[in-house]
Amino acid sequence: MRIIVVGAGKVGTALCRSLVEEKHDVILIEEKEEVLKRLSKRYDVMGFAGNGANFKILEQAEVSNCDVFIAMTDKDEVNMISAVLAKQMGAKETIVRVRNPEYSNAYFKDKNFLGFSLVVNPELLTARYIANTVEFPNALSVETFANGRVILMAFKVTENSQLSGMTMEQFRRKFGNILVCTIDRQGELIIPDGNATMQIGDKIYVTGKRVDMALFHSYIKPKSIKKLLLIGAGRISYYLLNILKNNRIKVKLIEQKMDRAQNFSQVFPEVSVILGDGTAKDLLLEESAASYDAVATLTGVDEENIITSMFLESLGIHKNITKVNRTSLLEIIDTRETTTIVTPKSIAVDTVMHFVRGRYNAKDSSLDALHHVANGRIETLQFQIKENNKIAGKKLSELEFANGVLIAAIIRNGKSIFPTGEDRLAIGDKIVIVTLLQNVTHIYDLLKR
């Protein structure tokens, strides 16, 4: 597809890379010429220097012929104006990044009077991700599919875990409609068969219905979060506190800027707001950080978040949630079993890629959702089986899938099925697939050739 991206910041750059990898025709609009030249050369994209809300620039970029127009600058108003112009000029779909809470009210979201195809708020998406993590604190990560019907969680198999030494067949007998999709063993990813055995140190990715996963989560380690400490009063904290408003979790927030601390204290009177440096060891000890069930370190400085997270882990914090913007730093912290990393850039890019791939329809089936897990090494895909699909009506055992492919779930008439080889695919089904294969755009890409 022909896709125009406006803005070459962190999200825009990552989007260009992902779109080029999937063989889309990408045009980049960026005000800074040196940035544009560097990225145009690196990713082999066509570039236009200028303001994405400028009619002449959009005309030069031939926005009238684009399939998807994506505005990702750091200015909400520029994104919205450029997308409105692009739509009027003939762009088929428009996606905008909007971060300001003022533009996240119910009227703007639900009525969508500006006609955007998708509104992406990285901080709000990250807050929702953290809220899921707070709900399931024993999991290293939590992803949702099929409008929340299916959940994918990552767990560490610890020394005293009852999962150690258990085969996949034994696991399925014990837990019913829950599947181990992938095992990460010392960096090697495995799609397990029935005879595969879990070992101490494995990171396992498990999927199932929300209610079944809640029971499994309790089985792993019956621990809930009653006290939460937030470090940093940014947009993520703002959205997270709104999400948790009706929750019974006791929340304390530490913020070093006076105006922000006062604002949060007024907006969220139920939250204990402390003025100070939440990354300072002495203050954390003074505020009894070790007594909290979970701490989310959400400042704007990656290094401070990582170092603070490491200190908190030394205090024995059960659940460490750490914001890291630069993916190059993930390896430093990703091996620690009590830590959940959130990367707003990656969450935003994944959201946009869900949409783009959903619009990139094949004749027989459509790929309408995509999630990256394990730092992008695992893809979870959602396909819809359409009328002329050749695999409709066949048993899963009759289909020869390529190595590294697992059918995790079938969504049929709003209900989730966690299949065996005897289940058949029907027209209208949505299937959730976990795979080690990259850049899959069609369900037939998953079959042996």
Which positions does each model-derived feature cover?
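Cytosolic regulatory regions of ion transport systems
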Residues: M1-R449
